């Protein structure tokens, strides 16, 4: 059963400017594992924007936006084939009673925008 669907679109240039103007931007919104992935991708603004959009999409699929939690509670990584995967903090497991669920995300981008979709399925 589908519990929620979320989508978000981000202007890559806006994220690029935020990174350039705020040295703490990446550390403030992304986990250590996400930052390790960004290093492998040479801190590509498209990649960072895609992850940002994915976090927003997941928050919308949860049905609350970012009420009571933050971007660091949602971690977007890649599996061995490059497919994006989501890890949630223990706080979110408890907050949304997500014991038996799957989260599916898709991330894409053009030269100017990054977009992400998230679907939460209850098993």
Curated annotation (Swiss-Prot):
Required cofactor(s): Mg(2+)
Enzyme class: transferase
Pfam families per the UniProt record, alphabetical: ACPS
Compartments (UniProt record): Cytoplasm
Binding site for Mg(2+): 8, 56
One GO CC annotation: cytoplasm
GO BP terms in the entry: fatty acid biosynthetic process
Gene Ontology molecular function terms on file: holo-[acyl-carrier-protein] synthase activity; magnesium ion binding
SUPFAM superfamilies: 4'-phosphopantetheinyl transferase (SSF56214)
The keyword Oxidoreductase is annotated on this UniProt entry: no
Keywords of the record: Cytoplasm, Fatty acid biosynthesis, Fatty acid metabolism, Lipid biosynthesis, Lipid metabolism, Magnesium, Metal-binding, Transferase
Reactions the enzyme catalyzes: apo-[ACP] + CoA = holo-[ACP] + adenosine 3',5'-bisphosphate + H(+)
Enzyme Commission number: 2.7.8.7
Role this protein plays: Transfers the 4'-phosphopantetheine moiety from coenzyme A to a Ser of acyl-carrier-protein.
Protein family according to the UniProt entry: Belongs to the P-Pant transferase superfamily. AcpS family.
Entries under HAMAP family matching the protein: AcpS
Protein name, per record: Holo-[acyl-carrier-protein] synthase
Source organism of this protein record: Clostridium botulinum (strain Alaska E43 / Type E3)
Gene expressing this chain: acpS
């Amino acid at each position: 059963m589908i519990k929620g669907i979320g989508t978000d679109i981000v202007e890559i240039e806006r994220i690029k400017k935020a990174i350039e103007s705020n040295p703490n931007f990446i550390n403030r919104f992304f986990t250590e594992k996400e930052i390790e992935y960004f290093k492998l991708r040479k801190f590509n603004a498209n990649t960072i924007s895609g992850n940002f959009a994915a976090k927003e999409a997941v928050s919308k699929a949860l049905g609350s936006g970012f009420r009571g939690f933050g971007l660091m509670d949602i971690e977007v990584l890649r599996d061995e084939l490059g497919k994006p995967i989501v890890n949630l903090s223990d706080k979110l497991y408890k907050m949304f009673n997500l014991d038996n669920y799957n989260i599916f995300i898709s991330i894409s981008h053009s030269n100017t925008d990054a977009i992400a979709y998230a679907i939460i399925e209850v098993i």
